[in-house]
């Protein structure tokens, strides 16, 4: 059991569902895609449960209505091209930081902690989204889903961040919202907090192997100290 405040040297934070409420823009792109395909679109609530494994998997879930099913390859090729076009045009139209995010980032910065954003979202969407919502400049390092050969739940992005920052895994805290985050953290040997408001396939984060559930990033900042 971890003791608090937790001594750390770096904090890395997930994007969708942790920093930003991106579901409205992700769902809007899905609606436009499905309209082009002449198909009905799932609800915003349903699409929110599909978020967290990158755009390709999101599109497959929207097409099939299942978490791990594979759609017809020709249909998927048409759908992913449509989705990427529409999402790229509206990546930060309705996406906003969750309550406490900016305050939390400011607190981490004031502590002198290294800060990174680690997401499974492709770089072509990650960077414009962070810039469009005013969060880009908080981070020394941004690792997207296609930056490295592997992404969360693989530990590689976290271990890469440790290497870049010159810290041990136990000194790097991951804050996320899903099973991907907790699995990556445990595999890397990092502590992990989760927020309860994100996109964990519709499941409560209390089911996950984590060190704390934090109501907001502002609350998370109160639970750490610089090592």
UniProtKB/Swiss-Prot annotation:
> What does the function comment of this entry state?
Specifically catalyzes the dephosphorylation of 2-phosphoglycolate. Is involved in the dissimilation of the intracellular 2-phosphoglycolate formed during the DNA repair of 3'-phosphoglycolate ends, a major class of DNA lesions induced by oxidative stress.
Q: Does the keyword Zinc apply?
A: no
As one GO molecular function, the record gives: metal ion binding
Organism name: Thiobacillus denitrificans (strain ATCC 25259 / T1)
Q: What is this protein called?
A: Phosphoglycolate phosphatase
Keyword terms of this UniProt record: Carbohydrate metabolism, Hydrolase, Magnesium, Metal-binding
Supply one GO BP term.
Answer: DNA repair
Q: Which residues form a coiled coil?
A: none
Family (UniProt): Belongs to the HAD-like hydrolase superfamily. CbbY/CbbZ/Gph/YieH family.
- Taxonomic lineage from the root: Bacteria, Pseudomonadati, Pseudomonadota, Betaproteobacteria, Nitrosomonadales
Q: What is its EC number?
A: 3.1.3.18
- Metabolic or biological pathway, per its Swiss-Prot or TrEMBL entry: Organic acid metabolism; glycolate biosynthesis; glycolate from 2-phosphoglycolate: step 1/1
